[in-house]
Amino acid sequence: MRLEDLRPTPGAMKKRKRVGRGPGSGHGKTSGRGHKGQKARGSGKVHIWFEGGQTPLQRRLPKRGFKNINKKVYAVVNVKVLEERFEANEEVTPEKLIERKIIKDLKDGVKILGDGELTKPLVVKAHAFSKSAVEKIESAGGKAEVI
């Protein structure tokens, strides 16, 4: 076998379709677009959401709800995470939570939730607490302070 003997696998090199190049090509005159109509025209594309003139789905369905621009979005932390990542009598602040990569950013503040158990007394400073989180922090001998 020599370099000049190399040939592409049959079917690997597909010929380019040259449309509008006479009747002998098989793609002449109308260039494979058929006769007249929207799709035969230059800019005759239909959007993927076009439903043939019937009222589109997004207009058939009723309007519902709204997005509250004043809603607070908290970065949430569960009590079990505080148990794992902090020592007894340590102070937990939003800055320390970011520093230890427990949360990415503050958003509208930090909310402590009550999933898991807490055995160490901790001084937790956050923007909001759930009732169960406050109970667990205080029963472990710690303090829950709202910033």
UniProtKB/Swiss-Prot annotation:
Pfam families: Ribosomal_L27A
Keyword RNA-binding tagged: yes
Gene Ontology molecular function, alphabetical: rRNA binding; structural constituent of ribosome
Keywords: Ribonucleoprotein, Ribosomal protein, RNA-binding, rRNA-binding
Residue ranges, compositional bias (Basic residues): 30-44
Positions of the UniProt region annotated as Disordered: 1-46
A biological process term (GO) from this entry: translation
GO CC, any one term: cytosolic large ribosomal subunit
Keyword RNA-binding: yes
Subunit and partners: Part of the 50S ribosomal subunit.
Function: Binds to the 23S rRNA.
NCBIfam families: rplO_bact (TIGR01071)
Family stated for the protein in its record: Belongs to the universal ribosomal protein uL15 family.
HAMAP family per record: Ribosomal_uL15
Protein name: Large ribosomal subunit protein uL15
Organism of this sequence: Thermotoga maritima (strain ATCC 43589 / DSM 3109 / JCM 10099 / NBRC 100826 / MSB8)
Lineage: Bacteria, Thermotogati, Thermotogota, Thermotogae, Thermotogales
